[in-house]
Amino acid sequence: MRCLYTNLDTFHNKKTELLTRIHEVKPDIIGLTEVQSKVAAGLVNDIDLAIDGYTKYINLCSRGVALYIKDCLRSTEVTPSTSFDTSCWCSLPLKNKDSLLIGVIYRSPNATRDQTCQMNTLITEMVKRNHSHLMIMGDFNYPEINWNTQTSDAPDDSPPQNFLSNYKDCFLHQHVLSPTHYRGQQQANILDLILTNEPDMIDKLHYSEPIGRSHHLVLDWIFKGYGCVQKVKTKKYFVNRGDYDGMRLYLEEIDWISRLSSISVDSMWEVVSTEVLAATDTYVPSKTFTSAKSHDKRPEWMNARVLARIKKKKSAFTRFKETRAGKDYQEYVQARNMAKSEMRRAVRDYEKEIAKRAKSNPKAFYQYVNSKTKSHEKIPDLKGDDGNTITNNKDKAEVFNNFFSSVFTVEDLDHFPDLPAKARLSELTDITFTPSDVQKLLQNLNSNKSPGPDNIQPRILKECAEVLAIPLHILFTASLEQGRLPTAWKEAKIIPIFKKGARTVASNYRPISLTSVCCKTMEKLVRDSLLHHMINNEFLSDTQHGFVKGRSCTTQLLKIVDKISELLDEGYDSNIIFLDFSKAFDSVPHQRLLLKLQSYGVGGCVLEWIRSFLLSRRQQVEVGGAFSSWLDVLSGVPQGSVLGPVLFVCYINDMPDYIKSFIYLYADDAKLLYRVSDEEIAGGVSCLQSDLDTLTEWSRNWQLSFNVEKCKVMHIGKSNCSCQYTMQDVNGRPYSLHETKEEKDLGVWIDPTIKFSIHVAHAANKAQQVLGLVNRSFTYKDSDLLKQLYVALIRPHLEYGNAVWHPFLKKDIQLLERVQHRATKLIPTLRHMCYEDRLKALDLPSLAYRRLRGDAIETYKYLHRFYTLDSNVLLPLNQCTSLSTRGHCLKLMKRDCKSSVRANVLGFRIVNFWNNLPEHVVTSGSVNAFKNSLDKHCYHLRYCTALEDLWKI
């Protein structure tokens, strides 16, 4: 295994050169010290330190140290018990059951005696660990030690002498015998060391020129051991280079009708999938990659000029190292600076070209952006229930699959709850669709989505939609008529997606199912028919905003904030209960779900198809190219499927019928709201507590339990008596709900003041972090590129859901605007301008105007029925509009209010602005037409940042 080490003296400004050196050396193991600057210590973002293709182990105490192990090598983080700040450790299994313990250490030249003693103790501890091989690299800052004689002239009991003594007591071997630190014409010293527990462990130690302005050489060497390489072969299809004309001709020549007649749906699917995959292999170029070699290609920006400058830099340094002459040092500095300039120029030119082609090739642009701004980390070693560490990918996959299966519900088939009869206008027993309907669905597929377990690419289906619509229509029709899915459609590949918490714990991941794209296409037909049936029969609860056309997170939050502000304005305190289902999507009992669908009038072949969709499913988990064994799916609706979320919505649809409080739903996200009653103040049973008891009984009957430890209460109002609420856990024990002072709900932070200053602070901080990452990651920052990056990556953090939390405090307005102010100053050619002029030069509206515009768009959508909600609750129309001779026909009612919170909800703050808009704007025929008309009418406000100016028309 090849290893590389250097003292980098700040990572972010040398990353480009470091990647160049990594491409040149191709190391399996990388050790770095001083990865962050003295000024920015503790402020480095985790993504900043990522190197594609490597697993990183980082300790950012003081100046920081880092270890990088190639992804194809199994590695495990090791935590020492000795409290020495700047070290990082991991272990690698080797062949023949050997193991390698690797450490990187940084000892400051200003280290205290205690810190030096701790470092010596740490080394002793690691030597005593049960590993056959030990390798420690780092900057130890002991120029006083002569490593050729392993002696020092330093006084007895001094740090160098103590280190040497400990080194000999541990029977270590030090391999660096030439200077590693050159600062001008000062004396060169050996500061960087490589320590091992065997004399012949390393070979071909090479000293090369520093990276950037660092004074430390780069060391690379061969470790004489063989790591356990996890080679995974993956076949990649280059779908952008496919011969789709040839593929269409190939597929058109197949007599689909005769091939698919009088056979089972399983046989039909085998015929269709086999032919599509055969056509893919024939007409789409592909290549098989091995994970061990997949990251060895050079950076795309590296060109011949860069390579030539690097070569000159190497030659100049070699000459200086031999002569130590001042002239040669100056020539080296000049060559170093020219190489760095050439690299920057190459990166800048590449980024400029990427930006130019962003419109014609947005995929390439965002791939590059994501490579700079997102951390692509593999799943680390997991901690098993027994405390043991799980390192093998197949074993990890088994752990995940066992955990995901452990939450399945064992349904009580002996006792089913009673369901009240529901009057209905129609029943859903069959679905009619044509080949044209199937073709339209195929043409609307997202080509960038992943294929399912069958490996059929969405791009193939989209390109060949017209010809494949015929066989798929035959298959879909037969599947529906028989009420049976092809068996392959019921097999899911599960990808664990990290949520939050420790990455080493399996319960901190959620399962996402990758299923057949063709199956998802048919699911859309069933989903749309089911939703249409539920809405037409007025079965769907008005409180549900998730996965329903014309409703969203924003519409749900607008309703609850409007109700809270109404209660506050009327002088009432209120309480919110944030409910949390336990593994909601995975624990839905199948037979109870089918029972509910029957009660809603779903029957015939549609019900049988859904029954087949739910039952007899199985899943396996993939981790790093390794697969778990198959396990049966006993309950739940597949996360990642098209139909699953709607089935869940149907399952909990009756929950609001049993309670008196206001309830707000978004799929499995549920909140209860009610004003504080006189009974509560007097110590009696409140409406909320009664509803919680009812919901506990409902969850017990329908076997969909609440995670009571995550259910919380928020008390709103200055004189709120802060009552305690309880719920029963799965074992029937009462549990007092925790009080929360701030809660992130559907992406928006809510606090008892309902002024949203907390959300504004979170949004501004997140946007600022991303802005800093963009600033550090991109060399080329002209107006076009930065505007694209800002609009795509930063502004969404400042605007998500702003119709809900529209700030009205001056400090909050300024806090948000400062982020955009700071972003526009990053463009060198615009820094001299004032903020408003920069906005005009970039054609970038102020955030204050964007929020006002967003309010108007929300109002337009409500009044023109783009939302399937009653607009009179939030935005009541002026009933006298028809009698007025002035203004437009959609004027809003002006209502009185007492509190600033009430005055700032959408239905109050937008009234004057909306009512003063001309009729041709508010009656636009589409949302896009409204946006264009509004922007033209309000062009003079586009760059305004002062709130009072925004209300002028």
Map each language-model feature to its residues:
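Short phosphate/oxyanion-binding micro-motifs
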Residues: 1-131, 154-155, 162-163, 167-170, ...
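Surface-exposed loop/turn segments and immediately adjacent short secondary-structure elements
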Residues: 222, 226-228, 252, 257-260, ...
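Non-catalytic, peripheral interaction segments enriched in hydrophobic/basic residues
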Residues: 288-289, 295, 342, 351-358, ...
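Conserved pre-catalytic core of RNA-dependent polymerases
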Residues: 404, 430-638, 674, 787, ...
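Active-site palm subdomain of RNA-directed nucleic acid polymerases
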Residues: 126-135, 526-544, 569, 645-675
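Arg/Lys-enriched, amphipathic patches
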Residues: 100-103, 133-137, 141-151, 222-391, ...
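Short, conserved micro-motifs composed of acidic
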Residues: 47, 179-200, 205-207, 625, ...
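Metal-dependent phosphoesterases centered on the DNase I-like endonuclease/exonuclease/phosphatase
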Residues: 20-60, 117-199, 249-263, 268-270, ...
